[in-house]
Each structure stands twice: as C-alpha cells, then as structure tokens.
C-alpha cells in the first residue's frame, strides 16, 4: 500500500514531538562515511544489518496473535527509542511494513543508506521471533519519494544471493 499524505502528516507530527540530539549528528555522519570508505558498501551493509539484528535481539517482541498486535508492539518499542512508527499490511506473498518518522539525520541523503540495512536487520529478526520462515528477510521495497515520506519494506522469501524475491 503506497504512503498517503496522512502518513506524511503522521511523521511530521511525530518529528515535532521528538527532540533530535545534535551532539552526535556530525560524529555519526563522519563515522559511517569513514566506515563505508574503509570496508566498502557491501560489507558495510552486512555489518549494519547485523547491528540491526543485535538491536532487535536486545529489544525482543513477545509472540503476537496477529499483524495488528505485532504492529502495536513494534510501535511501542519504536516510541520508546524515538524511531518512528509502522503500519503493517499483508501483501500477496509478502508482508509490507510502512515505516515513517524513522531516525532523521540532517546530513543529506547518504544517511538513508546507513539506516536501511539496520532496519532490515531489525525487522528480519522481529518477524523471525514471530515464527517467520528462516528463508525470509526484510528488504527495502521503495525509497521515499519525498522528504518525510515513509520507507516501504517487504518481508519475503530471499533468493540464493540474499535479495528478497519479487517486488
């Protein structure tokens, strides 16, 4: 389901309630840029996805009876750590996660490439904790079309190279 104007307004309202710490912005941007330059983008993505997996393991979710309960649990965790909100939809052969008001670092568009693998690791582990198939992974399906628009992530079966199968 594509994000709507209401989804963007929800994110803007969320950002207005949050206080982003400016003390780490430049440090984190420099650290990630240096890290990616030294190890390359593929290894950086693997590391960041593993970091997201570890975050999810440190913030485990109890088994949920349905997607609505899972959405509520994820939103509760994300509210506690200031990482935005999600809406979860069942698709044809995948589960779609609409993630808005994700951490925002005002350092250009490059930061998004660092955040996405972290989120992919988090969602992959959380869905596995719900009894998800080990052959499934969370992968970015669509980047935001405008600033503040939600990310679209699909949880689905992976191919032999680790990419999610289908669109």
Question: What are these model-predicted stretches?
Answer:
Residues 141-165:
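C-terminal edge-of-domain segments
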Residues 91-145:
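Short, hydrophobic/π-rich interface segment
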Residues 1-94, 102-112, 146-148, 163-167:
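N-terminal accessory segment detector
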């Amino acid at each position: 389901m594509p994000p709507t104007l209401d989804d963007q307004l929800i994110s803007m309202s969320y950002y207005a309630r949050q206080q982003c710490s400016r003390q780490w912005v430049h440090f984190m941007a420099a650290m990630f840029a240096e890290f990616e330059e030294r190890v390359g983008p593929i290894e950086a993505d693997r590391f960041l996805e593993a970091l997201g997996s570890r975050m999810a393991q440190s913030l485990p979710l109890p088994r949920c009876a349905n997607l609505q309960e899972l959405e509520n649990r994820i939103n509760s965790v994300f509210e506690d750590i200031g990482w935005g909100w999600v809406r979860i939809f069942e698709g044809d052969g995948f589960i779609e996660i609409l993630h808005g008001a994700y951490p925002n670092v005002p350092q250009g568009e490059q930061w998004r490439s660092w955040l996405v693998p972290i989120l992919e690791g988090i969602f992959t582990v959380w869905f596995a904790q719900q009894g998800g198939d080990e052959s499934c992974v969370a992968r970015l399906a669509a980047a935001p079309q405008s600033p503040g628009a939600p990310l679209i992530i699909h949880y689905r079966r992976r191919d032999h190279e680790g990419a999610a199968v289908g669109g």
